[in-house]
Amino acid sequence: STVAAAALPLMAQARTAAYSAAPQMVPMKAQYAPGQLLILPRSHYLYFVTAPGQAMRYGVGVGKAGLEFTGTATIDVKKEWPTWRPTNEMIEREPQTYKRFIGNTDAQPGGPGNPLGARALYLFQNGRDTFFRIHGTTQPNSIGRSVSNGCIRMLNEHVIDLYQRVPIGTKVTVL
């Protein structure tokens, strides 16, 4: 629709170049305030608005169809090398994959082998954890694809950069 197209960053409306996950400064519609994050799952990009009409664009991996987050949230928690545990829904969907987590409260310690990667930004709505995250990954080939259980994945070096830029309380919009 025209309204939806008007909300998109200028570069996302008519992408003619090949997909690139590399951070790049791009033009952005002025309706988004500096400091906000905008995520466009269909184009696999996250935009950090740096100034009116300008944003740093990062390539991301997003949730599989039916598992993706949409709407607005705030970053209420930030963690370096976070621990990880699959959600109960993930365990129910794929019990064979996550069988070591059935019937316990175990969590995988943070570190290079952890699926959340080097950093995680925890998305909340009205003070409640959504269980969706913007995080690093151990699967760099998943960037630019819709393969996750719903979270927004970034290359570790990119999520470290973003982590340093965004404070607690940052508004996140996923269209």
Task: Show the residue positions of the predicted features.
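Gly/Ser-enriched beta-turn/beta-hairpin loop segments
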Residues: 128, 140-143
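Short glycine/proline-enriched turns and hinge-like loops at secondary-structure junctions
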Residues: 51, 145-147, 166
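N-terminal targeting pre-sequences for secretion and organelle import
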Residues: 152-153, 157-175
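N-terminal export signals
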Residues: 1-13
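Gly/Pro-biased beta-strand-loop elements
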Residues: 17-132, 161, 168
